Amino acid sequence: MAELIQKKLQGEVEKYQQLQKDLSKSMSGRQKLEAQLTENNIVKEELALLDGSNVVFKLLGPVLVKQELGEARATVGKRLDYITAEIKRYESQLRDLERQSEQQRETLAQLQQEFQRAQAAKAPGKA
């Protein structure tokens, strides 16, 4: 019986480790999005300082291409909306992964107790 519990425990530990990896990836992704959000907010602020007489360029591959100020502002606004939506999605994903991780920890604790009880019950029989 202890061997069955031990195998189940190993499987649950692997699930928990995978959840921790997923959690780490999601946190890393969210941090990248936060950096992009900050960058784009700075660009938005800089574009707000310009008037119609200023010339704006965008980088397309290795080439700078002239862009209308209104178009540049709209592009940055859309990018900010997208990044904000992605951050919300990541936050939701992080909450789910944290909840699953907590449930997995509880399952592991229960299995460890079962395993210890099985080991204790097995030990007096051998003596």
UniProtKB/Swiss-Prot annotation:
One of its GO terms (cellular component) is RPAP3/R2TP/prefoldin-like complex. The modification N6-acetyllysine is found at residues 21, 66. It comes from the Eukaryota. There is a cross-link at residue 66 (Glycyl lysine isopeptide (Lys-Gly) (interchain with G-Cter in SUMO1)). Signal peptide: none annotated. Keywords: Acetylation, Chaperone, Isopeptide bond, Ubl conjugation. GO terms for biological process: chaperone-mediated protein complex assembly; negative regulation of amyloid fibril formation; protein folding. InterPro entries: PFD_beta-like, Prefoldin. CDD domains: Prefoldin_6 (cd23161). The modification N-acetylalanine is found at residue 2. It holds the Pfam family Prefoldin_2. One of its GO terms (molecular function) is unfolded protein binding. Belongs to the prefoldin subunit beta family. Binds specifically to cytosolic chaperonin (c-CPN) and transfers target proteins to it. Binds to nascent polypeptide chain and promotes folding in an environment in which there are many competing pathways for nonnative proteins. Heterohexamer of two PFD-alpha type and four PFD-beta type subunits. Component of the PAQosome complex which is responsible for the biogenesis of several protein complexes and which consists of R2TP complex members RUVBL1, RUVBL2, RPAP3 and PIH1D1, URI complex members PFDN2, PFDN6, PDRG1, UXT and URI1 as well as ASDURF, POLR2E and DNAAF10/WDR92. This is Prefoldin subunit 6. It comes from Mus musculus. The lineage of its organism: Eukaryota, Metazoa, Chordata, Craniata, Vertebrata. The gene is Pfdn6.
